[in-house]
């Protein structure tokens, strides 16, 4: 009898423990904000104030929200997604042309001159903004297709398309219960090689390409214990910290969930339109 009561007590206590909300979109925005002040001034340390008052969303978060809004517009259907993505990214750029760190030069010209064709980019912007598609696709094949459509609006170089696809698949797998080993196996199938956070801490520098950002960022996730430690690993290796933060934050947010105190702090720092985008996307796709 005592064993039964003890068992029931443990089960009840566990049910009262609030599980961190798993969110790749919010995880990406928070990771971007956390790294925003270290993009051009790396600290190569895990010891820093998480989301200090100086942190703010950069182009990474702005375009993540633009893609989320485009996916809301088309209600999960691939029809007109390319057109909606182009429209929303240009709209969000024009409404927020000078974020902390600025937009990439090629994207800036594409948006400001209202160009229609993609510009052949292999840059890590393809991976920083793609996380919302993981909630919309119902299978890995659908996630790949959505990623290709969205990424191809600007980053039609094979390396750009690959970087967006790997990130989207990693988030999808994390949301659907894959282990780190399974996610790592997928990432290594795209980017063969061995990495370690300690080695990256010693040697890694700012890199704008997908092929020199995505696998390094994924290693920060693989060697983490929770959402916060994954983001701290990003600042420890340095590099393009806001973009790495967005990529790592998306996967870690989907895999671990995000502690409530971090969510509340981030939401209080985000502009109103960004909170609205997140809440609308959450209502349509995350809470279904």
Regions found by a protein language model. Give the residues of each.
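Structured, active/binding-site neighborhoods that engage oxygen-rich ligands
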Residues: 5, 12-288
């Amino acid at each position: 009898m005592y064993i039964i009561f003890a068992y029931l007590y443990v089960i009840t206590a566990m049910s009262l423990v609030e599980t961190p909300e798993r969110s790749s979109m919010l995880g990406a925005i928070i990771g971007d904000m956390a790294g925003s002040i270290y993009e051009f001034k790396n600290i190569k340390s895990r010891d820093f104030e998480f989301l200090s008052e100086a942190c703010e969303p950069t182009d990474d978060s702005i375009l993540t929200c633009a893609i989320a809004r485009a996916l809301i517009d088309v209600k999960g259907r691939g029809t007109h997604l390319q057109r909606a993505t182009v429209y929303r990214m240009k709209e969000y750029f024009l409404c927020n042309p000078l974020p902390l760190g600025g937009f990439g030069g090629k994207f800036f010209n594409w948006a400001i001159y209202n160009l229609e064709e993609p510009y052949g980019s292999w840059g890590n912007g393809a991976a920083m903004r793609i996380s919302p598609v993981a909630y919309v696709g119902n299978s890995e094949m659908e996630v790949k297709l959505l990623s290709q459509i969205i990424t191809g609006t600007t980053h039609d170089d094979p390396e750009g398309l690959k970087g967006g696809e790997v990130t989207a698949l990693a988030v999808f797998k994390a949301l659907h219960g894959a282990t780190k080993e399974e996610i790592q196996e997928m990432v290594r199938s795209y980017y063969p090689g061995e990495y370690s956070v300690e080695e990256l801490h010693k040697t890694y520098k700012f890199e704008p390409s997908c092929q020199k950002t995505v696998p390094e960022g994924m290693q920060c996730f693989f060697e983490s214990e929770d959402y916060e430690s994954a983001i701290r690993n990003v600042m420890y290796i340095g590099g393009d910290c806001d973009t790495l933060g967005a990529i790592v934050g998306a996967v870690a947010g989907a895999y671990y969930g995000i502690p409530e105190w971090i969510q509340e702090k981030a939401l209080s720092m985000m502009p109103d339109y960004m909170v609205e985008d997140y809440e609308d996307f959450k209502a349509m796709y995350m809470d279904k």
